[in-house]
């Protein structure tokens, strides 16, 4: 699972997912990519599941780039706990995805293989996505 080695602060505010992604919205490394169409929190488990699905389908062919990294801690309170007594402890890590963000890139394979591998990874994501081609 992906998570930061160390952070400046243990806990973060939840924040808002306003607007579109201005950074990380162009294909930089591969020839094909998976682009987000909705805002959401994507957990490190979902990122890893998508990466594994793509790797399995492509087998040894091609290269995969994961363009997102979960850097936001999400805290969870224990079940049946009364209100108060502070914020819960960090349980998992998420990445805040905005529309337009590139999630995965793929290169060194044919378009048919890339399209199928990326569609399998897209089914692991909690949001609507689209397959895009560089150029």
Swiss-Prot record:
Q: Which Gene3D superfamilies match?
A: Ribosomal protein L10e/L16 (3.90.1170.10)
Q: Which keywords does this Swiss-Prot/TrEMBL entry list?
A: Chloroplast, Plastid, Ribonucleoprotein, Ribosomal protein
Location comes to: Plastid, Chloroplast
List GO molecular-function terms, semicolon-separated: rRNA binding; structural constituent of ribosome
Report the SUPFAM superfamilies cross-referenced here. Ribosomal protein L16p/L10e
Domain of life, per UniProt, equals: Eukaryota
Q: Which GO terms describe its cellular component?
A: chloroplast; mitochondrial large ribosomal subunit
Q: CDD domains annotated for this entry?
A: Ribosomal_L16_L10e (cd01433)
Q: Which InterPro entries does this chain map to?
A: Ribosomal_uL16 (IPR047873), Ribosomal_uL16_bact-type (IPR000114), Ribosomal_uL16_CS (IPR020798), Ribosomal_uL16_dom (IPR016180), Ribosomal_uL16_sf (IPR036920)
* One Gene Ontology biological process: mitochondrial translation
Per the record, the similarity remark reads: Belongs to the universal ribosomal protein uL16 family.
Oligomeric state and partners? Part of the 50S ribosomal subunit.
Protein's UniProt name: Large ribosomal subunit protein uL16c
User: What is the originating organism of this protein?
Assistant: Ranunculus macranthus
């Amino acid at each position: 699972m992906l998570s930061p080695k160390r952070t400046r602060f243990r806990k973060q505010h939840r924040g808002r997912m306003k607007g579109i992604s201005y950074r990380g919205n162009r294909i930089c490394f591969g020839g094909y990519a998976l682009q987000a169409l909705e805002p959401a929190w994507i957990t490190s488990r979902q990122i890893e599941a998508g990466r594994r699905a793509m790797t399995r389908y492509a087998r040894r062919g091609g290269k995969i780039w994961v363009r997102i990294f979960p850097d936001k801690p999400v805290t969870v309170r224990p079940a049946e706990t009364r209100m108060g007594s502070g914020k819960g402890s960090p349980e998992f890590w998420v990445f805040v995805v905005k529309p337009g963000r590139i999630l995965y890139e793929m290169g060194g394979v044919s378009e048919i293989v890339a399209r199928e591998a990326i569609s399998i990874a897209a089914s692991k994501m909690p949001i609507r996505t689209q397959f895009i081609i560089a150029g």
